[in-house]
């Protein structure tokens, strides 16, 4: 017995047996595949199993898998199908990924994230949205400025009208005051509003003809009885109703 070559011959025989067995199994598998899928002489081709219509365009493994196989559906993702369909139809604008994915390094991104990052950027979308908000605010500011300008025009018109009315009233009062002063110098009778020429409102009280207005007792002792000067107005002794009556009578006169 050859002990020196026993190990080599045993290992070589095992390798040959294994190679022959694998080759035989491979030939049987190829023969089975030819009989089931690639034999044009059989009339039962495709009667038992329904294959995809695009099997010529697909890979050999997909070509051998029937449509009703559930394992193939589990492996493929519906998002991948949607992406392929959108890319095939030319609609490459996909919704943006979550904002947290932009903080990741580029090596960890998948192809889908890269496509999304190229086609639609949330930064660009936010920029457009903020620009729209700024434009709306500018339009609103212009609208408010227009309202303020219109209100200012109305206020200016009212101010000019009030100024004209004040000047008209002051002119009419000054004319009446001159006439009243001329009549007071001759008849010492009161008519119209008292002016500074007749009753001056100064520090220390009322003044009448540049003299302080005193009480009725002082006036009586100096100027005589009250009946002699019935047309004079004694504001300190008269009541409010009497003053109003005197003023109304002076207006009518």
UniProtKB/Swiss-Prot annotation:
GO molecular function: structural constituent of cytoskeleton
One Pfam family linked to the record: Spc29
Region (Disordered): 1-20, 31-123, 210-231
Residues bearing the modification Phosphothreonine: 18, 240
Subcellular location: Nucleus; Cytoplasm, Cytoskeleton, Microtubule organizing center, Spindle pole body
Free-text description of this protein's post-translational modifications in UniProt: MPS1-mediated phosphorylation at Thr-240 is required for spindle pole body duplication.
Biased composition (Polar residues): 1-12
Location of Phosphoserine modifications: 65
InterPro entries according to UniProt: Spc29 (IPR031392)
Compositionally biased residues, Basic and acidic residues: 69-91, 211-231
Alphabetic keyword roster: Cytoplasm, Cytoskeleton, Nucleus, Phosphoprotein
GO cellular component assignments: central plaque of spindle pole body; cytoplasm; nucleus
GO BP term (any one): spindle pole body duplication
UniProt subunit comment: Component of the SPC110 complex containing at least CMD1, SPC29, SPC42 and SCP110. Interacts with BBP1.
Family designation: Belongs to the SPC29 family.
Function: Component of the spindle pole body (SPB) required for the proper execution of spindle pole body (SPB) duplication. Links the central plaque component SPC42 to the inner plaque component SPC110.
Protein name, UniProt field: Spindle pole component 29
Source organism phylogeny: Eukaryota, Fungi, Dikarya, Ascomycota, Saccharomycotina
């Amino acid at each position: 017995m050859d002990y020196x070559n026993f190990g080599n011959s045993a290992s070589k025989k095992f390798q040959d047996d294994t190679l022959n067995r694998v080759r035989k199994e491979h030939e049987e598998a190829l023969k089975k595949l030819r009989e089931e899928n690639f034999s044009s002489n059989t009339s039962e081709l495709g009667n038992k199993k329904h294959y995809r219509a695009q099997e010529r365009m697909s890979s050999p493994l997909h070509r051998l898998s029937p449509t009703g196989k559930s394992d193939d559906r589990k492996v493929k993702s519906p998002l991948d199908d949607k992406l392929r369909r959108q890319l095939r139809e030319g609609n490459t604008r996909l919704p943006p990924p979550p904002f947290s994915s932009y903080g990741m390094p580029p090596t960890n991104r998948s192809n889908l994230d890269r496509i999304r990052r190229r086609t639609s950027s949330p930064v660009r979308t936010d920029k457009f949205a903020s620009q729209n908000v700024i434009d709306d605010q500018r339009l609103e500011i212009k609208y408010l400025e227009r309202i303020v300008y219109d209100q200012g025009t109305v206020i200016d018109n009212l101010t000019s009208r009030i100024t004209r009315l004040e000047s008209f009233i002051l002119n009419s009062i000054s004319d009446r005051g001159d006439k009243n002063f001329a009549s007071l110098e001759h008849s010492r009778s009161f008519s119209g509003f008292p002016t500074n020429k007749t009753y001056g409102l100064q520090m220390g009280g009322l003044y009448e003809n540049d003299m302080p207005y005193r009480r009725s007792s002082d006036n009586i002792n100096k100027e005589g009885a009250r009946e002699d000067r019935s047309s004079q107005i004694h504001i300190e002794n008269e009541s409010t109703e009497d003053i109003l009556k005197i003023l109304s009578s002076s207006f009518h006169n």
